[in-house]
Amino acid sequence: MYHRLGTLSGRIDSGERHVWGKKKCALAAVLVTVLYGAAVTAVFSWVYQMNDDRFMKEVLSGVYNGTPDAHVIFIKYPFALLIRELYMLLPGWDWYGIVMAGINLLCLALILYRCLRIWETWKGKCFFLAMVMAGYTAAWLLRMLAFTYTTVAAMAGAAALFWYGSGSRQAKGESAGSAAVTVVLAWLSYLLRDSVFYMLMPFAAVLFLNRIALLGEQDRKQTVKQLVLPVVLFLLVGLSRMLDRAAYGSQEWERILADADAR
């Protein structure tokens, strides 16, 4: 089995190398994602899977209260506030659905971009692009089209894990921008559904410890630098939690939240 996998890897790596720059990889990833999104939209319909998502949309858009409101209970207040501002700026658009679909497609584009950056041969790029698209379609197309905030949070968290884990191949030279992508995706997962974020943390811890092990004891400076990412992430999580608690700090909201938890 290992011999066959090694043979396959050798075949993929063989051939003329085409090292693309960041702009070309980003353009290719965005183009594939846009074409994929347009194709599935032309063939299928996007639907709200859960009543909770429909409820949040109506609150954010102002249908429920008469004016757009960010108190949607299920997702953290700072992110809900951002969506509410979109409804205030351009009413009449389904911004909740657009944002949820956009996050799914953004995660796909980032995964494609990372694959294009890692693999240098045409065969490698084409093979793994095909693998990613086939795997995404088989495992996630239904979840993407019939979306809910929980599955979108899971997609953001999974993309963060992939981005961080694949970045360990060049841990010493990873840019601040690459680390920022990991932080933003993981933070987004928390803002959408904190329980999903917490479930992903053990896997993130394993990847973190693996990266530390790859650096070794001799490179203590780089080891200390690896602590910046989790520190920044949990500062953002802590700040978001404080803002969320402040938004729901009244006794009336505490009672409503208790009823929601009991449900």
Language-model region placement:
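Start-transfer (signal-anchor) and selected internal transmembrane alpha helices
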Residues: 1-39, 123, 212, 220-233
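Extracytoplasmic catalytic/substrate-binding loops of multi-pass membrane glycan-assembly enzymes
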Residues: 41-60, 68-81, 90-94
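Transmembrane-helix motifs of polytopic, lipid-linked glycan transferases
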Residues: 102-120
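Short hydrophobic alpha-helices at membrane interfaces in multi-pass membrane enzymes
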Residues: 123-130, 162-187, 224-225
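Aromatic- and kink-enriched transmembrane "portal" helix at the membrane-lumen/periplasm boundary
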Residues: 130-156, 187, 191
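Membrane-interface alpha helices of multi-pass inner-membrane proteins
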Residues: 177-194, 205, 234-238
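Transmembrane-embedded, aromatic-rich helix segments that form part
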Residues: 194-211
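Juxtamembrane membrane-water interface segments immediately following transmembrane helices
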Residues: 198, 222-263
